[in-house]
């Protein structure tokens, strides 16, 4: 690990990408200005995940009926562009895309 810093996941995906970009710049400048001293990551602490599939963006009837509002809010806001947007398949088979979400 060459640079690590905590950040908030508040806001929409574009806000989070903006913070990641700023942290990436900050980390790059820090590494260029100082000798690089890395810290070996513990394999047990590593997190692995597969590439997302479009089917993972579906909001099911079960989720709508059983999940709290903050779960649905977070799922939709994390699946805004450029990711495959959250969607719901209606009884008639039509797909309803969620392009964004706001809490009022």
Write out the residue ranges for each language-model feature.
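Active-site-proximal loop/hinge segments within enzyme catalytic domains
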Residues: 1-104
């Amino acid at each position: 690990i060459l640079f690590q810093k905590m950040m908030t996941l508040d806001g929409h995906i574009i806000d989070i990408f903006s913070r990641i970009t700023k942290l990436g710049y900050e980390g790059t400048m820090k590494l260029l200005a100082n000798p690089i001293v890395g810290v070996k990551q513990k394999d047990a602490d590593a997190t692995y995940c597969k590439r997302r599939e479009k089917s993972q963006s579906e909001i099911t009837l079960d989720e709508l009926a059983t999940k709290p509002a903050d779960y649905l809010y977070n799922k939709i806001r994390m699946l805004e562009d450029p990711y495959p947007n959250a969607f719901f398949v209606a009884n008639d088979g039509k797909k309803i895309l969620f392009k964004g979400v706001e809490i009022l």
